[in-house]
Structure formats: C-alpha cells, structure tokens
Amino acid sequence: MSDLLCSAKLGAMTLALLLSATSLSALASVTPDRTRLIFNESDKSISVTLRNNDPKLPYLAQSWIEDEKGNKITSPLTVLPPVQRIDSMMNGQVKVQGMPDINKLPADRESMFYFNVREIPPKSNKPNTLQIALQTRIKLFWRPKALEKVSMKSPWQHKVTLTRSGQAFTVNNPTPYYVIISNASAQKNGNPAAGFSPLVIEPKTTVPLNVKMDSVPVLTYVNDFGARMPLFFQCNGNSCQVDEEQSRKG
C-alpha cells in the first residue's frame, strides 16, 4: 500500500514538473509588477517592484538578466541586488542598471533581453517534502534615444505587412522595434489557428507565419503595456497592409 502511495506521489510530482513554464510562473508567489520592461537609453536605470503574495512565508528573490539567446549576463545590463529577502505580503525592489559597454548596443534599433526572478521558499521542517523554486521570465527591451518617442495613436505595429502565397503568409516588420505576435486567427478574438505559436519578430526582419490560413489572418500584437491589440489587414493581390482605422477600433 505504501508503495502505491509513493508511486502516486511520484506521479503527481512528475506531472507538476511537466507543467509549462508559463503555467508555473502564474502560480509564483514572488512576481514583478509588470509583464515587460522598457529600458530607455536616457533612463540609465529602471526599477522593478517585486511582490511576495504569500500570506504566511517570506521568500528569497533571485534576479538576473539573460540575453536574447537565454545566456545569463552581467553586462551590458545587470540587476541589483541579485538576491533579497521579501517578507510575506510585502514588496521588494530591484534596479536594472546599464553598464559602461551599453553604448555598444545598436543605436538604430531595439535590443531584447530577458529579466528573470526566481523565488526561493524557506526550508520546510516537514520530512519528505519537495520544494520547487518557481521562476518568472519577462521580456526587456532596451530602446536607444532615437527611438524613445513612440505614438500610441499610431503604433509601429501598424506598419507590419503580410505577403501571401496561397495559404502561406509572411510577416514583414520594417520597423526598428520588436513586434510580438501572440495570436493569429480567422477572426477577432478567435481561437489561435491550429499549430500557431507566438512570434518574436526582430527589427527589420521577415518571418513566415507558422500556420496555413484559408483567409487573411487577424493578428494580435502585444504593446508596451502588455495589452493585446488586433491587427486587421486589407489585401491588394498578394500584398496586405494594416487597416489602421479598423485596428484602432479593435
């Protein structure tokens, strides 16, 4: 009987570990105060508030920066302090600081990094207890001075175009900013097209839409505030432009 109970516990643990990183981060006790960070060159540094939402326990919060490929770095951006204690239902704060070689980043386009925070729970006094350190990872965009002024009325994402070839579409980003596409569907607020996965489109690049579509897709992008906004398109032949009026109305 004890073997069966042990097996059941191991199965439950395995299932929990197989949950996606996104699902786990949603359960984290220590979370940042936003879903993305914008670091303007003129700011020199930015502050991030970390909240411990656990009603009873204090946590350690470990923070760091990764480059676009997921490598942990301490330059051209670093986090201070890298580790701190945050008491129950209290806030902590970290500073993302630019280092001297930040001047080597491109001045004509955004650069993308990742801000990470891992919660470390206090050691449990209960025997045979599995503790999991959950981690939250959000995008951090470094924006050079020439690109700091952005218009919410005429967002750069409205400059995205599509090129059609049968059921295949290519997404073109002619701007110096990153474009994050979180959804592609046949209609506004529709279910994602089968097989679609979110796109991170680098500045001035073109990527294929990773699904086939019978009709012109409605894309959803993520803006600076983490809001999801629609992109409706009008096509002339195989070239499709954003319908700005309809996209603004949502």
Swiss-Prot record:
Family annotation (Pfam families): PapD_C, PapD_N
Gene giving rise to this polypeptide: yfcS
GO biological process, one term: cell wall organization
Protein's name in the database: Probable fimbrial chaperone YfcS
GO molecular function, one term: protein folding chaperone
Effect of inactivating the gene: Deletion of the operon under classical laboratory conditions does not result in any major effect on E.coli capacity to form biofilms compared with the wild-type strain.
Entry's localization field: Periplasm
Signals that turn on the gene: Expression is negatively regulated by H-NS and subjected to cAMP receptor protein (CRP)-mediated catabolite repression.
